[in-house]
């Protein structure tokens, strides 16, 4: 894959490994490397622009759910070196509510929910992301 680090076997490998590095590896600052400076991230909560809001949001989530894991289950994708790559990947998100934040005071409850993230990528970076989380499963 032109423009991507040689350590990735293919595009799904890139998507799964950067997700693991950021969340399980707690390498939040690597978002600045893997997400473009002006990336739009579109979700049911609205649109943010840039990798800095993604980094801030990730730190807030890890404060509230310090053991949070994003377990990549499947990646469907298409693309090529000329036009870039697009993925849609399904994730199982799990963690324990141990910190205060969006969901209030720590409850100690374990949560599990699904996420679908669609990413457009080129040159070892995500430049557009659409994400939806099934938050209806969270009862804290």
Regions found by a protein language model. Name each.
Residues 1-138:
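C-terminal and inter-domain tail/linker signature
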């Amino acid at each position: 894959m032109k423009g991507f680090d040689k350590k990735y076997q293919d595009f799904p490998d890139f998507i799964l490994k950067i997700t693991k590095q950021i969340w399980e590896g707690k390498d939040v600052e690597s978002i600045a490397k893997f997400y473009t400076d002006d990336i739009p991230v579109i979700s049911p909560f609205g649109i943010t622009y840039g990798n800095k809001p993604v980094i801030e949001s990730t730190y807030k989530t890890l404060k509230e759910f310090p053991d949070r894991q994003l377990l990549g289950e499947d990646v469907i994708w298409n693309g090529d070196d000329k036009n870039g790559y697009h993925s849609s990947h399904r994730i199982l998100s799990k963690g324990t509510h141990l910190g205060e934040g969006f969901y209030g005071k720590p409850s100690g409850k374990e949560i599990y929910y699904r996420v679908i993230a669609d990413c457009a990528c080129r040159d070892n970076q995500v430049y557009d992301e659409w994400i939806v989380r099934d938050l209806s499963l969270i009862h804290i």
